[in-house]
UniProtKB/Swiss-Prot annotation:
PROSITE patterns: COMPLEX1_ND1_1, COMPLEX1_ND1_2
Any Pfam family: NADHdh
Listed InterPro entries: NADH_UbQ_OxRdtase_su1/FPO (IPR001694), NADH_UbQ_OxRdtase_su1_CS (IPR018086)
Localization annotation: Plastid, Chloroplast thylakoid membrane
Functional note: NDH shuttles electrons from NAD(P)H:plastoquinone, via FMN and iron-sulfur (Fe-S) centers, to quinones in the photosynthetic chain and possibly in a chloroplast respiratory chain. The immediate electron acceptor for the enzyme in this species is believed to be plastoquinone. Couples the redox reaction to proton translocation, and thus conserves the redox energy in a proton gradient.
Keyword match Glycoprotein: no
Catalytic reaction annotation: a plastoquinone + NADH + (n+1) H(+)(in) = a plastoquinol + NAD(+) + n H(+)(out); a plastoquinone + NADPH + (n+1) H(+)(in) = a plastoquinol + NADP(+) + n H(+)(out)
Name by which UniProt lists this protein: NAD(P)H-quinone oxidoreductase subunit 1, chloroplastic
GO CC annotations on file: chloroplast thylakoid membrane
Protein source organism: Anthoceros angustus (Hornwort)
C-alpha cells in the first residue's frame, strides 16, 4: 500500500536495525495493508446493509432493525453469524465441485477490484498503469461463478438465473467499458490515481461528471445493472425464479452471494467517485481547489490529517451514490428480460459508443 512514504521508510530502517531480513518486512507490510483494506471493506458492507434496511423501512413507513445494538447497527453482523452456524447442504444430484467453488469465484474478483481504488492521497494498494481496465477485466469473471453456481445446482430455476446473469453481464459490460475508455481519453491515462489528479487541477468544475454528462448517466445505469440491483435484478427474481442461482444454497455459501452483491455495489460507488466526482479532493464551487491543507503540526502529522480527510471525502461521495442506488431499488419496478436486453444493446451501447467517438473527436481537435 502506498501510504505516507516517510512512515514506511522509518519502519523499514527500524526493522533493519533490529536484524530482520528485507523480505520479512515486505511480507509484513503487504499483509498489514491487505488486512486493513479487508477490515475496512467488511465494515463498509455492514454499514451499507444497515443503511439499506433503515432507508427501505423509512420508505415503507416501518421501523426497521432496532434490537441488535443501538438503532440495530449490528443486525447484519448477527445475520452473518447465524448463516455461519447453519448447515451447508449440497444437492445430491448436483455437481458438488461447481456448486462449491461458484460463490468463491463470485467474491474473489470483487475483492480484487479494491486493489486499484484510491481512497485518498497515496492510499492505494496497487497503483497500476491500467487500473480501470484491471477492474473491468476482473469484474467480468464474476458472472462465470454465477453460471457455475446455477449449473451445479441441478435446478431449473438456478440454471435460468445463471443464464440471465451471464446475458446481463455481457449486455452491460460493453457500455461500461466504453464509458471508462472515454474517461481515459480525457485524462490520457488508465491509472485511477492519474484520473483523480487530472480532475483536481480544475476544482469542482473539473469533475468528469460535468465534462462527460452523457457518459455519467450511461455509467450509472450500467453499473446498477452490473450489480444486479432493482430494477435490474432479473437473475434472482423471486416472483419468477424462486431465488435464481441462490435457490439451492444455504449457510455461509448463501451468505457469500449477498456479501458479493454489497461488495460490488460499494466498488461501483467508489469508481463513480474516482472517475466522475473528483475522488478524494474536496472542491467547492466558485472557490479555488486546495488539494493539500497546511496545518500547524509536523510534516508527518499534517500528511496523516490530509490522508484521513481524503478518505472521509471519498467515502462521503461514495455513500451519496449508494443512497441513490438504495432509493432506486425501493421505488422502481423490475423490468422484463427483453426490456433489460433492449436497454443494454439498443440504447446504452450506441449512446456509450457515440459518447466515446465524440470525446475522441474533441481530443483530436484540442
Amino acid at each position: 500500500m502506498v501510504f505516507n512514504m516517510n512512515l514506511k521508510e522509518q519502519a523499514m530502517s527500524l526493522f533493519y536495525e533490529s536484524g530482520f531480513p528485507k523480505d520479512f518486512f515486505s511480507f509484513l507490510w503487504i499483509t498489514a495493508s491487505i488486512l486493513i483494506l479487508v477490515s475496512g471493506v467488511v465494515i463498509g458492507v455492514l454499514v451499507i446493509v444497515w443503511l439499506e434496511r433503515k432507508i427501505s423501512a423509512g420508505i415503507q413507513q416501518r421501523i426497521g432493525p432496532e434490537y441488535a445494538g443501538p438503532l440495530g447497527i449490528i443486525q447484519a453482523l448477527a445475520d452473518g453469524t447465524k448463516l455461519l452456524l447453519k448447515e451447508d447442504i449440497i444437492p445430491s444430484r448436483g455437481d458438488a465441485l461447481l456448486f462449491s467453488i461458484g460463490p468463491a469465484i463470485v467474491v474473489i474478483p470483487v475483492l480484487l477490484s479494491y486493489l486499484v481504488i484510491p481512497f485518498g492521497h497515496n492510499i492505494i494498494l496497487a497503483d497500476l498503469n491500467i487500473g480501470v481496465f484491471f477492474w473491468i477485466a476482473v469484474s467480468s469473471i464474476a458472472p462465470l461463478g454465477l453460471f457455475m453456481a446455477g449449473y451445479g445446482s441441478n435446478n431449473k430455476y438456478s440454471f435460468l438465473g445463471g443464464l440471465r446473469a451471464v446475458a446481463q453481464a455481457i449486455s452491460y459490460e460493453i457500455p461500461l467499458a466504453l464509458c471508462v475508455l472515454s474517461i481515459s481519453l480525457l485524462s490520457n491515462s488508465l491509472s485511477t490515481v492519474d484520473i483523480v489528479e487530472i480532475q483536481s487541477k480544475f476544482g469542482f468544475w473539473g469533475w468528469n461528471v460535468w465534462r462527460q454528462p452523457i457518459g455519467f448517466i450511461a455509467f450509472l445505469i450500467a453499473s446498477l445493472a452490473e450489480c444486479e440491483r432493482l430494477p435490474f435484478d432479473l437473475p434472482e427474481a423471486e416472483e419468477e425464479l424462486v431465488a435464481g442461482y441462490q435457490t439451492e444454497y444455504s449457510g455461509i455459501k448463501f451468505g457469500l452471494f449477498y456479501v458479493a452483491s454489497y461488495l460490488n455495489l460499494l466498488v461501483s460507488s467508489l469508481f463513480v467517485t474516482v472517475l466522475y466526482l473528483g475522488g478524494w479532493n474536496l472542491s467547492i464551487p466558485f472557490l479555488p481547489n486546495f488539494p493539500y491543507l497546511e496545518w500547524k503540526f509536523t510534516a508527518e502529522t499534517s500528511e496523516v490529517i490530509n490522508v484521513i480527510i481524503g478518505i472521509i471525502i471519498t467515502l462521503a461521495k461514495a455513500y451519496s451514490f449508494l443512497f441513490i442506488s438504495i432509493v432506486t431499488r425501493w421505488t422502481l419496478p423490475r423490468v422484463r428480460m427483453d426490456q433489460l436486453l433492449n436497454l443494454g444493446w439498443k440504447f446504452l451501447l450506441p449512446i456509450a459508443l457515440g459518447n466515446l467517438l465524440l470525446t475522441a473527436s474533441f481530443q483530436l481537435i484540442a
